């Protein structure tokens, strides 16, 4: 079923459950979160993983949208409900809504989960922020970047009609719940950090009066005023206020009060002119100078637009003028308070196309969101690069307008320089698979039309070259081969077009290191490269959510869809799950410690055919399990990993202590890298919803995960590492 189904269900589900203008019922987010955290009632989850968001949403949707009260929701009823919501939300009476306006309308009626920001009402951040861009993208039939009542109605009608497999004229609660659980990825805020997907808003073309392709100070000022007027006209509150903090329980980070950092100048810090930009043994200092003092507010206003804020970058005494800066990230932006550290993207070639530092032209500076150890990204990168091409990573100190903003992760861009270093050529097609609420970028075959693939895969290389070389057609063919080729001939069919062993290493790392933002759970957040010979390669992208418990919802149906008692995460289908029910291992479930993630979880998840299809081939499954065993035996051995962690601790501990804008405490860092810590939870004991996720030290995770994998029956039978 096309991507539309998931987003429209989110649309209807949020409307029905959360008392929007469409419905008018009361909703307490903490009650629903508590229900989700407890898992399904005994006996509810059927084979194949019946537990999921639909279990809670569907009955309310049917009850509230069922106009004729026949116990079913028909396509017509769904369409009328969706159209009414868009019509009521169109405060500016423009006849349609863009994503920002739709998101704010949802947020005005949808209470944020506890801990997502200040107590006062706000429409600038909430579940609608995550849902709206994907809804508009999916339902926008005329591709004008907006959703009209008519488009909403047609999309909602199509979802219900397509999901009505028995052609009964509509869906009852059970049918709707089943369709939702089959088609929905993690619901916003539950299934792993994500964020508002959709396309960025294009402002440069409208405000670039001098035609130089970028906005100067006066042009940016005009654009900001226009943005504020648009939001006010559509019922918004302008630029968001004091910001939104992370939800409580995400690791007990002990966030410290923010205050200004020390003043630093180039003469106060060491320079490393002979060291690479990604040398792991140093902490280089980057100086950014913005022309305006309200640079943070300005970048917040331009978030999710095509506007770069210009600055001067100084590295090792070298002045690099005309760089462009914007905030990057989704949950790492939207759940971080203003004044605290947010991730940055710096384009060195913003004005001067030839400007680089050490051969690199893009900097990705990460705020270590949800990682009190600060080490997840650098460790994942170091381990992954042992087995396949992956971005390099190290640490830098960032000084903005003379004030230290502390320690950032510095992660290599997936660009031509990356290709040259890892594949010996700058040629070929590159795609980014961005995280999205639907988590549907896993190479599922969606037919021969290009549109659905362009929605899921963001081409980062030349469009002209992609057309000339047939790269999009080749990507569609890869998806088709995965989908339609029998297991006994799949390896031979894939070998000319996919680096199969590289894909198996990619999947093994994803699972062995429990990447909560990984392919296995989100079907997104990775990169794809097609080399000049026509072979595809998979490259890790988002690495900060590894080395810990899985997020609440992962692939439906657990391992092989065995349902209750399936080997996804311990007895009962979930870690410590109730007898007689359980999701069969939905991404580890809310109480999973993460160390018990089954290496064969989610093989029936249609969103992730690389796992389901490749591992259905006995020889490839055996090779994958051998790779998992290699990672467990070698890379997770604390005799190997411990000295690396200790080296980084010695390098950055003083930096973290001095960091006044960090998202976690010094004590949390010290606990994360401690050699002496509470042991990892015993098998089946779980870690408690939320907080246990980040209370496990790196050593406890490595020891526990290694032990679990090497004792796993399937892994034990795999060939040992060479």
Whereabouts are the PLM-identified features?
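Phosphate/dinucleotide-binding and metal-coordinating scaffold of catalytic cores
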Residues: 2-7, 21-47, 108-121, 181-205, ...
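Bacterial N-terminal signal peptides
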Residues: 9-21
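EF-hand Ca2+-binding helix-loop-helix modules
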Residues: 39-64, 75-76, 80-84, 103-138, ...
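Short, highly charged
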Residues: 69-75, 79-87, 95, 143-149, ...
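A broad, structural micro-motif
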Residues: 73, 97, 147, 171, ...
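EF-hand and EF-hand-like Ca2+-sensor regions
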Residues: 88, 94-115, 156-158, 162, ...
